């Protein structure tokens, strides 16, 4: 099951050329970029590991691409994403986020249903990947 988080997640994986165009857009807007990675694909896992330091005031998309490739090389079977932070007053938020690397095999999720009081159903998502210890999931 393909993980769909961030922009472009329903499209085929971005090529390096397409990633460079997105990075050029991020730089042209004056946004700060950072690279994050994880092996826990749960949709509510908002706290991915930060790769290096955030790239503030970067003027060349090649610097961000270098960090992406370094992370891909060190973590080839992890999810890797780029976040772009807009520090404009009133926005001050992540304005763009997209995945740039995926594991070769994405095992998907188990939907667990639980009967609860008053005929209420509770649902829980469980990633098959998390059945293995951290660092050995893919």
Curated annotation (Swiss-Prot):
Its main location: plastid. GO terms for molecular function: ribulose-bisphosphate carboxylase activity. Heterohexadecamer of 8 large and 8 small subunits. This is Ribulose bisphosphate carboxylase small subunit. PANTHER family: RIBULOSE BISPHOSPHATE CARBOXYLASE SMALL CHAIN 1, CHLOROPLASTIC, RIBULOSE BISPHOSPHATE CARBOXYLASE SMALL SUBUNIT. It is found in: Plastid, Chloroplast. It holds the Pfam family RuBisCO_small. In this alga, in contrast to plants, the small subunit is encoded in the chloroplast. The basic functional RuBisCO is composed of a large chain homodimer in a 'head-to-tail' conformation. In form I RuBisCO this homodimer is arranged in a barrel-like tetramer with the small subunits forming a tetrameric 'cap' on each end of the 'barrel'. Signal peptide: none annotated. GO terms for biological process: reductive pentose-phosphate cycle. GO terms for cellular component: chloroplast. The keyword Protease does not apply. SUPFAM superfamilies: RuBisCO, small subunit (SSF55239). RuBisCO catalyzes two reactions: the carboxylation of D-ribulose 1,5-bisphosphate, the primary event in carbon dioxide fixation, as well as the oxidative fragmentation of the pentose substrate in the photorespiration process. Both reactions occur simultaneously and in competition at the same active site. Although the small subunit is not catalytic it is essential for maximal activity. InterPro entries: RuBisCO_ssu, RuBisCO_ssu_dom, RuBisCO_ssu_sf. Belongs to the RuBisCO small chain family. Keywords: Calvin cycle, Carbon dioxide fixation, Chloroplast, Photorespiration, Photosynthesis, Plastid.
């Amino acid at each position: 099951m393909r993980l769909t988080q961030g922009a472009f997640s329903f499209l085929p994986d971005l090529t390096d050329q397409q990633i460079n165009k997105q990075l050029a857009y991020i730089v042209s807007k004056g946004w700060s970029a950072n690279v994050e990675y994880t092996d826990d694909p749960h949709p509510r896992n908002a706290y991915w590991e930060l790769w290096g330091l955030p790239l503030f005031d970067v003027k060349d998309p090649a610097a961000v691409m270098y960090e992406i490739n370094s992370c891909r090389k060190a973590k080839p079977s992890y999810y890797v994403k780029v976040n772009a932070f807009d520090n404009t007053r009133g926005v001050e938020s992540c304005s763009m986020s997209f995945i740039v690397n995926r594991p070769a095999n994405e095992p998907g999720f188990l939907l667990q249903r639980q009967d609860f009081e008053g005929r209420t159903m509770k649902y829980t998502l469980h990633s098959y990947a998390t059945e293995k210890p951290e660092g050995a999931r893919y």
